[in-house]
Regions:
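The beta1-alpha1 cofactor-binding region of Rossmann-like NAD(H)/NADP(H)-dependent oxidoreductases
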Residues: 5-6, 26-37, 69
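A glycine-rich helix->loop->beta "capping" turn
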Residues: 18-21, 40-54, 60, 150
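Substrate-binding pocket helix/loop in short-chain dehydrogenase/reductase
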Residues: 63-64, 71-76
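Active-site helix of classical SDR
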Residues: 87, 129
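Residue(s) in the substrate-gating loop at a strand-loop-helix junction
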Residues: 113
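Active-site-adjacent segment of SDR/Rossmann-fold oxidoreductases
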Residues: 118, 134, 139-149, 194-197
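C-terminal helical subdomain
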Residues: 153, 173-262
């Protein structure tokens, strides 16, 4: 829940000005009851539920050795529980509709991050939450397919109220344009549409630089099981020599900064 609901109401006003129908909800989506009210409000207002976009978030960036318990808990609660709670109540609604014999073509679109997929210094709390959302997306897609619901995620890079003070500010109008949320909206809109019915369990990177599919964890080099820890050194070294290097924040192999010991 944000402290200022006026941006949400502003969007409502814009939608209504174009002839659409909208309603703002100020409940805390990381609370069980608040998330339930959110879903009920949508169903009561529009008569049905077609898509849920989980996009609430906060930042409490800090190096691990300096991070407080409150900074950890706050980020995990808003991002991770704030994705689970609305999704859970939406899933129950669609399950009940399906069991009642009614047609269901539902969508859940979650918000992950390249920080959660690839890792970014100073964001153990945020990255852990966003990685959790990516895994949540994969598992929820398997569970909800039987009810006619797809679950995907978007890992965006854009300037918003949350990120505008994160990192160097764009120096030119072209750089600002490249980080505009307008590059994120199309993939979210498409995933919410009927055209995306065959796509589920995926994470899409989206920015002014690229639209890509993050392919997730895959098993790399293997070795037969070893039951003696004193013999593991050479085995691990051999596997590491064949393994792909971790991707960096740009998603490319080998661009992840290698840890340095002083």
């Amino acid at each position: 829940k944000g402290g200022d609901e006026s941006p949400a109401q502003q969007v409502v006003n814009e939608i209504e000005a174009m002839g659409g129908k909208a309603i703002a909800n100020g409940d805390d989506i990381s609370s069980w009851d608040g998330a339930e009210r959110l879903i009920k409000t949508a169903v009561e207002t529009f008569g049905d539920l077609h898509a849920v976009v989980n996009n609430a978030g906060i930042l409490r960036d800090r190096m691990l050795a300096n991070m407080s318990e409150e900074e950890w808990d706050a980020v995990i609660k808003v991002h991770l529980k704030g994705t689970f709670a609305p999704s859970r109540h939406a899933a129950a609604y669609w399950r009940d509709q399906s069991k009642a014999g009614k047609p269901v073509d539902g969508r859940i679109i979650n918000t992950s991050s390249v920080s959660g997929i690839y890792g970014n210094v100073g964001q153990t709390n945020y990255g852990a939450a966003k990685a959790g959302i990516a895994a949540f997306t994969t598992i929820a897609s398997l569970e909800l397919a039987r009810y006619g619901v797809t679950v995907n995620a978007v890992a965006p890079v854009a300037l918003t109220r949350m990120t505008e003070n994160l990192g160097p500010a764009p120096e030119t109008e072209a750089e600002r344009e490249q980080r505009s949320p307008k590059w994120i909206a199309p993939i979210v809109t498409w995933l919410a549409s009927t055209e995306s019915a065959g796509i589920t369990g995926r994470v899409f990177e989206a920015s002014g630089d690229v639209l890509a599919i993050a392919e997730g964890w895959h098993r790399g080099p293997t070795h037969k099981p070893v039951d003696d820890p004193t013999k593991l050194g050479p085995v691990v070294e051999e596997m590491m020599s064949k393994a792909r290097l971790n991707a960096g924040m740009d998603g490319r192999d080998g661009t992840w900064p290698q840890p340095q010991k002083k």
